[in-house]
Swiss-Prot record:
Its cofactor is Mg(2+); Mn(2+). It is found in: Cytoplasm. It catalyses: 2 D-alanine + ATP = D-alanyl-D-alanine + ADP + phosphate + H(+). GO terms for cellular component: cytosol. Keywords: ATP-binding, Cell shape, Cell wall biogenesis/degradation, Cytoplasm, Ligase, Magnesium, Manganese, Metal-binding, Nucleotide-binding, Peptidoglycan synthesis. It is an enzyme of class 6 (ligase). The gene is ddlB. Monomer. Cell wall formation. This is D-alanine--D-alanine ligase B. GO terms for biological process: cell wall organization; peptidoglycan biosynthetic process; regulation of cell shape. The keyword Metal-binding applies. Pathway: Cell wall biogenesis; peptidoglycan biosynthesis.
């Protein structure tokens, strides 16, 4: 008898709506591939009961906290249920932009200059040294929560007097935030499925940057796959992404986002260990370019579950 597969979708994070869309698409794709798949929303069902409910494997279509931050992965490990995507450590590291950057920097990989702040430091008032370090980054800046996805809580700061508001917004979403030097782009993303690096995608948002609206709602965001890089640039990008992926210990499938600055240098932005799988999503787009249908993609991801 075929394995009974739980597709985890929805959840309780700020990315719930995106996850519901991802999960519905994954569910349809798995069923098209002949898989006995069923939707499970952790907001409504106690996922600690998955094994008792007769499930043999889990496809994680959750985004954000409680889904791709290592907590769920740890519980599934304890239950002895194979699941898609990266393990506990890689999931936790990838969700945490600050720790990802520290690890990549330590591995000698390029990341944008940044300053990290905690809520306690912000509430106490920034020291002169912190102000000087932020000032040294120049303008514009990008302010982002360390552990939030889908560009939630992110702001581009073009004038110094807008920084305070941007910090306040980011701290609504996390206790730790990043203030980064603005890289002028373009932005690229590279998906990995198993050992296969899929063709890179160049992202061209209509607005200032690739924010929540550009990712999920706008029809004006343009995606180019192939990305239009020459062969040596594409090879350099793929090599960097693979090094970044391995440094974090990622497995299964995922995506690494990268920015090409005006100096011609690629800089790592972040890793996504449970990327979106909606109609606007990038991993399915790259898979299509590589000759893989959506159904083939989700079945392949499920096969990689351990």
């Amino acid at each position: 008898m075929a394995d009974k597969i739980a597709v985890l979708l929805g959840g309780t994070s700020a990315e719930r709506d995106v996850s519901l869309n991802s999960g519905a698409a994954v569910l349809a794709g798995l069923r098209e591939g002949g898989i006995n798949a069923h939707p499970v929303d952790p907001q409504e069902v106690d996922v600690a009961q998955l094994k008792a409910m007769g499930f043999q494997k889990v496809f994680i279509a959750l985004h954000g906290r409680g889904g791709e931050d290592g907590t769920l992965q740890g519980m599934l490990e304890l239950l002895g249920l194979p699941y898609t995507g990266s393990g506990v450590m890689a999931s936790a590291l990838s969700m945490d932009k600050l720790r990802s950057k520290l690890l990549w920097q330590g591995a000698g990989l390029p990341v944008a200059p940044w300053v990290a702040l905690t809520r306690a430091e912000f509430e106490k008032g920034l020291s002169e040294e912190q102000k000087a370090r932020i000032s040294a980054l120049g303008l514009p800046l990008i302010v982002k929560p360390s552990r939030e996805g889908s560009s939630v809580g992110m702001t581009k700061v073009v004038e110094e007097n807008a920084l305070q508001g941007a910090l306040s917004l980011a701290f609504q979403h996390d206790d730790e935030i990043l203030i980064e030097k603005w890289l002028c782009g373009p932005e690229f993303t590279v998906a990995i499925v198993g050992e296969e690096i899929l063709p890179s995608i160049r992202i061209q948002p209509a607005g200032t940057f690739y924010d929540y609206e550009a990712k999920y709602l706008s029809d004006e965001t343009q995606y180019f796959c192939p990305a239009g890089l020459d062969a040596s640039q594409e090879a350099a990008l793929q090599s960097l992404v693979l090094q970044a992926w391995k440094a974090l210990g990622c497995t299964g499938w995922g995506r690494i986002d990268v920015m090409l600055d005006s100096d011609g240098q690629f800089y790592l932005l972040e890793a996504n260990t449970s990327p979106g799988m909606t109609s606007h999503s990038l991993v399915p787009m790259a898979a299509r370019q590589a000759g893989m249908s959506f159904s083939q993609l989700v079945v392949r991801i499920l096969e990689l579950a351990d």
